[in-house]
Structure formats: structure tokens, C-alpha cells
Amino acid sequence: MSAAATAGKLGRAPADPGKAPGVAAPGASTAAPPAKEIPEVLVDPRSRRRYLRGRFLGKGGFAKCFEISDADTKEVFAGKIVPKSLLLKPHQKEKMSMEISIHRSLAHQHVVGFHGFFEDNDFVFVVLELCRRRSLLELHKRRKALTEPEARYYLRQIVLGCQYLHGNRVIHRDLKLGNLFLNEDLEVKIGDFGLATKVEYDGERKKTLCGTPNYIAPEVLSKKGHSFEVDVWSIGCIMYTLLVGKPPFETSCLKETYLRIKNNEYSIPKHINPVASSLIKKMLQPDPTARPTIHELLNDEFFTSGYIPARLPITCLTIPPRFSIAPSSLDPSNRKPLTVLNKGMENPMPERPREKEEPVVREASEPVDCHLSDMLQQLHSVNASKPSERGLVRQEEAEDPACIPIFWVSKWVDYSDKYGLGYQLCDNSVGVLFNDSTRLILYSDGDSLQYIERDGSESYLTVSSHPNSLIKKITLLKYFRNYMSEHLLKAGANITPREGDELARLPYLRTWFRTRSAIILHLSNGCVQINFFQDHTKLILCPLMAAVTYIDEKRDFRTYRLSLLEEYGCSKELASRLRYARAMVDKLLSSRSAANRLKASS
């Protein structure tokens, strides 16, 4: 049996690309880089706590963000670091002071944790909760429209966090997907208090607002004075975006967008549940006094009558969950008991999904080529810019860790002369693409199975309970798993299942081929992975994030935005691999077209 294994491990990190996780980066990004080097060890002079600076997480404005760990307790945080040389103007200092002042006064399950701040002669350091699963912005880029139960799950937590803010007289004023962070348990954490303000007395209307919020309310645009209602408007925009897949007033021109907001010009697609449409319309009332208050929202029928999962699996970040086997939110028989269960309870009580096999219907919005055309266009664009032929190449400026892939192939074994290709994903699940074009995946819990027919329909089974027709394939899958455990990786204990995993669906291997130089693997979530045989370098391309992850000979794992590589350039090594990737994606598209022509003629 021939075999080869990929390498590269990766821990996830917080935040929005282009800013620190949980707080705004003040100022504009055009400023010159600071002359001073950020120290490897950050020392809080008051508490004498020492933090070790770790992996780079993102940048934006004047700030850079790193993973930092307490030298004594080993506890890990996100450290936002701002050079004082870029905080020279009084309003810049004042803005940062206000942001810190508001954020440090807050402590809630759905607000990014604030763990302190300090400074030395050159930098201001802010210590924040680490949100390893980034933000709803990255989720939106990968998934576009979510299922209704997922939207309900996230919105409920956003509302709870915002209830706490309003209860403490804080208006956030910039609620948007990129400021709603996710921890390892996919809990929402409201962050970035750079535009937040505190209401000093009842009835106070704020007149000024610096910056340009994404989901700006009409009363802010008209400068008539605004208050807590602007956050409810923003949540209406967020709800629309989560369910429809794009913001309600979005255009390519800012002026046109603002005109649409002023005229309340938006439309809700017909396929959206009327109960959801009704709540969106209530929150997007042009008259702020006509909107529900933050404390009224969770009593709306959208929340009281629909299925709310208690937890969601990590797979939801890239693949829709298994709600085809969960109760429909539109099923009247499910409404009454759920209403009763949700009333007065701190946490929603999920309805147990029916335990039965049921194929998942592929979403209509999914492109036929699984985003290969988009990827080809992105690669054509970056290659045409000749990124390695620059006088000054600044590849590090193109790095964007927020675009790190959720899944990639960590091991593979080719036994296609008899059975198929076996592979392991980075979460330790194992799959086989059989020669008959069916797929079988064993989850990391060692028992759950996902079977994908040739037509893409999916069934969910277990090792202990499955039809006789799958006995041979399950036996082969176990054989592949054992081979990879013994030869290609350190054998590890089974992972303990977590709540929400019963809703998980994993991406699967759509197709693959080998050349003399590499193996090319195309996953169902759109990612293409290329493992080069000679030097063991790897590329993972994601068309939805428009990003590439490059794993070099030293197993160094770095993720870049393709548009930024066009701007800042890259090394000759990466450029040659991107040219190769374009040819391979072209080949994937050509073979897909040929297969479709064959199907049509048969």
C-alpha cells in the first residue's frame, strides 16, 4: 500500500481580520509602522504579571493582536497592542480611554471578557478574552445564509448580551457581524466598544458619532439624536443578514446605501418564514420609538415558537448542520411545548431531533462547481499581478489569520487500485472516497457515521447500528483508520463527544487526483488542498474567504488573503505554487465539465 501524510497543526485564534479581538483598533491604517519592536514578554507594572507574546492574530488601524499567555498560570488571552507613537492626537487618546473605560466596567457571558490593561514607554496593552472561533463575519463569508435554528441560536445570545449593555446604560452603536466574536463553544461574545457610549441621564439623545457603523440607523444619519434604539436596528440588520445571506441595504456605493436606509428601502425574500420577516420589519422601523425595546425581543414569536439548539457543533462554521432530522420550526405540533419550555428559562430547552435516517437535501444556493470558478478567478488575478516580481515584497503584510481554514486533510492513503482513497481531517475524523463514488466518514467520537451516496444525499448511522449493506465499507473504513493511526500519525484517544455534536455534518472529499508532483484534494466546503511530494509543502485554498494557507518545509502554518498578496507581493516559492494551483484548479473544472457531459450523453 502506498501512503503519504500531510503535516501541520494549528490552534485557532480570535477576532475579526483587521482588528484586535473584542475592541476597536483606533485610527486609520495608513499610519507608518512603529519603529519600536513589540517585546516578547509583556509586563504589567502594577500587578507584576508577565505575559509571553505568542501567535499573531490580526491587525487593523493602529493595533496588532497576538495570543498572549500568563507566564505563571499559563492562561491564554488575546493581547491588543497599540504603539503610543500612533496615539499622539488628543482625540485618539480620548477615544481609546473611553473604550477601555466602558469595556472594563462590563462582565457578562455574552460580552468579550476584559482582563486588564497596562502600558510601558512605547505601547498600550489590553488583555482580552481569547475568542478562538473568530467572529460571525467569517461564519457569514463561509456560509452566507444560515438555517433558521442557527440564526435563532446566535440572535438569542446577541440579544442577551445587548440586554446587559442597555441595563448598564451602554449603547454599543456598532453591532455588526465582525464585532460578534465566537469562543470554542460557539458562544457569542459582543466586542469592540470603540464607538460605544454611556447614557448619563434618562432621555438623553446622543448627537455625535465618530466612524461609520455598518448597520447605521436612520436617526443617526439624520443627526436628530439617537439612543438605545440604534442597537435594536442593528440587530434587525444582523438577523436579515444571517437569514438572507446579505445585508438589507447593501449596495456598492455608500451614498446609495445611506439613501436606502433613509427611505427604508429593502425587501425580504419570499422564502423567509413570515414570523422571522415580521420581527425583522419591527426592528427595522424607521421611527425608533416604534421599534421593540431590547427587553421585548425574546418574547417575540420568532424566539418562543421555534427550535433553539442548546449548542451547535464546530462543523457549523463551514457546513450547514443536521437540521433535516431536527423538528421544523414551522411545524405547528412543535410550537406549544417549546413555548412553554422557553418561558422564564435561562437557557432554551432544545427539542430532541427525531432519531432516524434522513437524507440532507443539498442547498439550492450551492454552486454546481462548488466554488471552483471563483477560486480560478482569484488565482488568475493574483498570478496576473506577478506578486514575486516586486522591488519590495512585504508578504507578512498580507497575512490574515482570521481566514484560517476550519477543516483540512491531515493524513491520506491511496488504495484506489482496489478500494479508494482514505483520509483523515484535522479534527481526527476519518473518511474514504470509494471507487464507486460513495463516501463514508467516521467522526472523531469513533462511533458516528456519515454516508454520502453518489447523488450527494446523506445518511447518519453509527458503528453499532447500520444496515448490512454497509458492513464491508465500514470494515474497510476501520482498516484505513488503523493503517493511518499506525503509519501516519500518533495514535490518540477518542475525543469525548460534546453537546451539539449530534447536529454535526462534516465536509467530505468530492474528488482528488495525483500528478508526479502533488496530490490535489477538493472538499465539499469548497476548499482545495495541494500537497507537494518533494518538499512536503502544502497549499489550502478557500474561495469563500479568498485566502490561501501555506505550510512550508518547517511546518510553519500561515494564512494570506489573496487580494493582499496582489498588493504586497510574495516570495518566489509561494508564487510558483500559486501558479501550479491555478493549473490544478483548471484541471478540476475541466474534469468536472467532462464528467457532466458524460452524464448528459448517457
Curated annotation (Swiss-Prot):
It comes from Bos taurus (Bovine). This is Serine/threonine-protein kinase PLK1. One of its GO terms (biological process) is regulation of cytokinesis. Activated by phosphorylation of Thr-208 by AURKA; phosphorylation by AURKA is enhanced by BORA. Once activated, activity is stimulated by binding target proteins. Binding of target proteins has no effect on the non-activated kinase. Several inhibitors targeting PLKs are currently in development and are under investigation in a growing number of clinical trials, such as BI 2536, an ATP-competitive PLK1 inhibitor or BI 6727, a dihydropteridinone that specifically inhibits the catalytic activity of PLK1. CDD domains: POLO_box_1, POLO_box_2. It catalyses: L-seryl-[protein] + ATP = O-phospho-L-seryl-[protein] + ADP + H(+); L-threonyl-[protein] + ATP = O-phospho-L-threonyl-[protein] + ADP + H(+). There is a cross-link at K336 (Glycyl lysine isopeptide (Lys-Gly) (interchain with G-Cter in SUMO2)). Serine/threonine-protein kinase that performs several important functions throughout M phase of the cell cycle, including the regulation of centrosome maturation and spindle assembly, the removal of cohesins from chromosome arms, the inactivation of anaphase-promoting complex/cyclosome (APC/C) inhibitors, and the regulation of mitotic exit and cytokinesis. Polo-like kinase proteins act by binding and phosphorylating proteins that are already phosphorylated on a specific motif recognized by the POLO box domains. Residues 51-303 form the Protein kinase domain. Residues 349-362 have a biased composition (Basic and acidic residues). Catalytic activity is enhanced by phosphorylation of Thr-208. Phosphorylation at Thr-208 is first detected on centrosomes in the G2 phase of the cell cycle, peaks in prometaphase and gradually disappears from centrosomes during anaphase. Dephosphorylation at Thr-208 at centrosomes is probably mediated by protein phosphatase 1C (PP1C), via interaction with PPP1R12A/MYPT1. Autophosphorylation and phosphorylation of Ser-135 may not be significant for the activation of PLK1 during mitosis, but may enhance catalytic activity during recovery after DNA damage checkpoint. Residues 1-32, 336-362 are annotated as: Disordered. The modification Phosphoserine is found at S101, S135, S267, S333, S373, S448. Residues 13-32 have a biased composition (Low complexity). Its EC number is 2.7.11.21. The modification Phosphothreonine is found at T6, T208, T212, T496. ATP binds at residues 57-65, 80, 129, 176-179, 192. Residues 491-505 are annotated as: Linker. The active site is at D174 (proton acceptor). It comes from the Eukaryota. The POLO box domains act as phosphopeptide-binding module that recognizes and binds serine-[phosphothreonine/phosphoserine]-(proline/X) motifs. PLK1 recognizes and binds docking proteins that are already phosphorylated on these motifs, and then phosphorylates them. PLK1 can also create its own docking sites by mediating phosphorylation of serine-[phosphothreonine/phosphoserine]-(proline/X) motifs subsequently recognized by the POLO box domains. Belongs to the protein kinase superfamily. Ser/Thr protein kinase family. CDC5/Polo subfamily. Residues 192-219 are annotated as: Activation loop. One of its GO terms (molecular function) is protein kinase binding. InterPro entries: Kinase-like_dom_sf, POLO_box_1, POLO_box_2, POLO_box_dom, POLO_box_dom_sf, Prot_kinase_dom, Protein_kinase_ATP_BS, Ser/Thr_kinase_AS. There is a cross-link at K19, K490 (Glycyl lysine isopeptide (Lys-Gly) (interchain with G-Cter in ubiquitin)).
